[in-house]
Amino acid sequence: MKFAVIQFPGSNCDFDLLWAIRDVMGAEAEFVWHDEKSLAGFDGVLIPGGFSYGDYLRCGAIASFANIMPEIKRLAKEGKPVFGTCNGFQILVESGLLPGVLIRNEGLKFVSKWQVLKVENNQSNFTTEYAKDALINLPIAHGEGQYVADEATLAELKENGQIVFTYADENPNGSVENIAGIINKEGNVLGMMPHPERAMEELLGGADGRKMFASLLKNFLVTVKN
């Protein structure tokens, strides 16, 4: 199974993401520049955090029109895994691959710290290695992470079990329903503001991110082989 780690101008978590999936988890992965027009040969996509295009206009807005995006949408439509963290999550909502929008933090300040999350749905392809209602600790680092959506969208997210992670001990950005991460209806696209790729080794502060990548590899490897 081979992953494309997409690089945009301003990405700064790309090496973390590559290290997590390749060096720690043992999967095949390589960088793909945003201006490429093909993802032939790849079985999944990882979109890193950072400040794509300097966060001009809106976070993720310009990146959503990058040349590589039609290919990312193609893989998503084919049921291949697509994961976006932080700015990657912003790109996924701006491109329409996930519902809702991410706006400026409620406190109007950049927040950088370790954050306790609750695993709301451990039956998704990205969370099966976690226990239901497990509390995990992952880093966050963002200024525009407040997730908002209309009532109809929120009702649909709840009904379909698309709310995968919520903020547990406190809400750091004002996200509605404490939402920290969601999946699409089909279950193959996950976006989240926290950074699991930064929680892969106890030596570095914690390893709660490992199970997210382990779930991804376990569940999608079967799909790719079939």
UniProtKB/Swiss-Prot annotation:
Pfam families found in the cross-reference section: GATase_5
E.C. numbers: 6.3.5.3, 3.5.1.2
Pathway membership: Purine metabolism; IMP biosynthesis via de novo pathway; 5-amino-1-(5-phospho-D-ribosyl)imidazole from N(2)-formyl-N(1)-(5-phospho-D-ribosyl)glycinamide: step 1/2
UniProt main location, coarse:
cytoplasm
As its record notes, the protein acts as a catalyst of: N(2)-formyl-N(1)-(5-phospho-beta-D-ribosyl)glycinamide + L-glutamine + ATP + H2O = 2-formamido-N(1)-(5-O-phospho-beta-D-ribosyl)acetamidine + L-glutamate + ADP + phosphate + H(+); L-glutamine + H2O = L-glutamate + NH4(+)
Q: Does the keyword Methyltransferase apply?
A: no
GO annotation, biological process: 'de novo' IMP biosynthetic process
* Annotated Glutamine amidotransferase type-1 domain residues: 2-226
Q: Which UniProt keywords apply?
A: ATP-binding, Cytoplasm, Glutamine amidotransferase, Hydrolase, Ligase, Nucleotide-binding, Purine biosynthesis
Its function, per the record, reads: Part of the phosphoribosylformylglycinamidine synthase complex involved in the purines biosynthetic pathway. Catalyzes the ATP-dependent conversion of formylglycinamide ribonucleotide (FGAR) and glutamine to yield formylglycinamidine ribonucleotide (FGAM) and glutamate. The FGAM synthase complex is composed of three subunits. PurQ produces an ammonia molecule by converting glutamine to glutamate. PurL transfers the ammonia molecule to FGAR to form FGAM in an ATP-dependent manner.
Name of the protein in its database record: Phosphoribosylformylglycinamidine synthase subunit PurQ
